């Protein structure tokens, strides 16, 4: 679901391309590459990488999710053993949570050592950016930050995205229920649409109560879920940081209105 990039710090590092984000919003991936490159990273996309296996893992399809994950493990291992990697950078937190769990997922399988090595260098893009010299800026827009469950609870990354947005000059606010789910939750919005819809309505209401210019999030699933319920533009955190440091204005800011949520085909 994410895009992952591997980066070597020229500071080298790397990234990866996830399946849903590639289809739903390629601007996020483009912004990630631009920003990391601008900050001195050598960004590469490992040949053979693909879906992290998160969605099928959520659905209990263990064999299918492990087969998908194994392709990534092999692809990244080739890079690690080749020119080397400092990090596997992931810009969708739902995928990041899964990749960081590869060591546990494969603990009793032949790829156990390789899976543990991959999981050990997997990082959310906000973790990487906190280690780089992101310049200060003075953007000024009021941004309501939505903390994805997979980021704040799954990965225990609670402050980095907000710190980075503040450094870029955005006025950051949060909804009163910032610790609660928006209802996307992997495949939950597909399997339990009624309850998911209630969670979405509550989250949209509390975000709109902050009267922001922009809503920011770090997970494509949350962005699609919340964006389908509000006219306030919702933008990935990395797109805002890219814009603040010289990149293009995010396209979502010029296309307000509720976004239709595409329904994926789940085998």
What are these regions (language model features)?
Residues 1-267:
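Iron-sulfur cluster-binding electron-transfer modules in prokaryotic oxidoreductases
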